[in-house]
Design a protein with these regions (language model features):
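A short C-terminal helix-loop "cap" of Rossmann-like NAD(P)-dependent dehydrogenase/epimerase domains
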Residues: 59, 203-219, 267-274
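Short, flexible catalytic-loop segment of classical short-chain dehydrogenase/reductase
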Residues: 189, 193-204, 257
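Short C-terminal tail/terminal secondary-structure segment
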Residues: 245-276
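Canonical Rossmann dinucleotide-binding motif of NAD(H)/NADP(H)-dependent dehydrogenases/reductases
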Residues: 4-42
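C-terminal helical subdomain
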Residues: 125, 191, 209-244, 249-253
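Conserved mid-core segment of classical short-chain dehydrogenase/reductases
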Residues: 57, 65-76, 80-85, 91-117, ...
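Catalytic loop of short-chain dehydrogenase/reductase
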Residues: 17-24, 30, 97-184, 194-198, ...
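Short-chain dehydrogenase/reductase
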Residues: 79, 127, 131-132, 175-176, ...
């Protein structure tokens, strides 16, 4: 692992959501280790069986604490284990998202409501549950930083993203709400709206390749990679951003503020001329 700058030297944290080496959370874990942090890794038991988290654990010397973030008892128990392992924590990464409706290719107007509730609970309400039980266990260190990964679907409708548009909107609202309540202790809570990224999770979304190409063509800087996102998260976990909180921070190469690119105009002109 290459040398870093020591931006997180002496800091301890929890990283939720790493599945395999393509995961954004996986790349964030590597970057945090590079910068001197110690942390625990966590994911749902079923994800641990499907993924390769043990390899990341060995590479970063980070213990794994399984946790079903939809269960109060599980999260409460996990925080006690974190307390025993690390004492307090200086940062938390929430990189958790799941939609049975998307996986089952249900249209938004015909979603299964039980699955819908699962999507909201696991992808968004889990952030509230994690912060509540971490605070209750007394492991949130003053001056800490919490980051949850979001997507522009929280503000704009991407039809194939279905109920995850709603889940990300709720996630961002929870981050703002909790951020206002933890600010008196210097604890920051933000979301990072990452561009479409080629991960195992993203590949499960119908039309993902089209979303990725669209964003790549429209963003002036192009789509940032998982490693780019990891470096951004390191900055947000560090003391260099201690006055940034309750924000949704777009990390998308300029996609959110661009109108249309020359490349896209040329592609559209060709497409429409072919149709004529």
């Amino acid at each position: 692992m290459s040398d870093g700058y020591g931006l997180l030297k002496g800091k301890k944290g929890i990283i939720f959501g790493a599945l395999d080496e393509r995961s954004i959370a996986w790349r964030i874990a590597l970057a945090c280790k590079r910068e001197g942090a110690d942390f625990v890794l966590s994911n749902a038991p079923i994800a641990l069986r499907l993924g390769t988290l043990n390899a990341l654990s060995e590479e970063t010397n980070a213990p794994i604490i399984p946790c079903d973030v939809s269960s109060d008892d599980d999260v409460k128990d996990m925080m006690e284990k974190v307390k025993a392992e690390l004492g307090g924590v200086d940062f938390i990464l929430h990189a958790i998202g799941m939609s049975p409706n998307i996986r089952k290719k249900k249209e938004y107007t015909d979603i299964n409501y039980n699955w819908y509730q699962q999507s909201l609970d696991i992808s968004a309400i889990s952030l509230h549950r994690i912060l509540h039980h971490a605070d209750e266990a007394g492991i949130l260190n003053d001056g800490g930083s919490v980051i949850a990964l979001s997507y522009i679907g929280a503000q704009r409708i991407f039809s194939k993203y279905s109920d995850m548009n709603d889940a990300k909107a709720l996630l961002e609202s929870i981050a703002r709400n909790y951020g206002s309540r933890l600010a008196s202790r210097g604890i920051r809570v933000n979301t990072i709206s990452q561009a479409p990224t080629k991960t195992s999770a993203g590949s499960g979304i119908k039309g993902f390749d089209g979303m990725y190409t669209f964003a790549e063509k429209l963003a002036p800087l192009g789509n940032p990679s998982a490693d780019d996102c990891a470096d951004y998260c390191v900055a947000m976990f560090s003391d260099l951003t201690r006055k940034v909180t309750m924000q949704n921070l777009f990390h998308d190469g300029g996609f959110v503020t661009n109108g249309i690119s020359e490349e896209m105009m040329e592609d559209l002109a060709k497409l429409y001329s072919e149709e004529d």
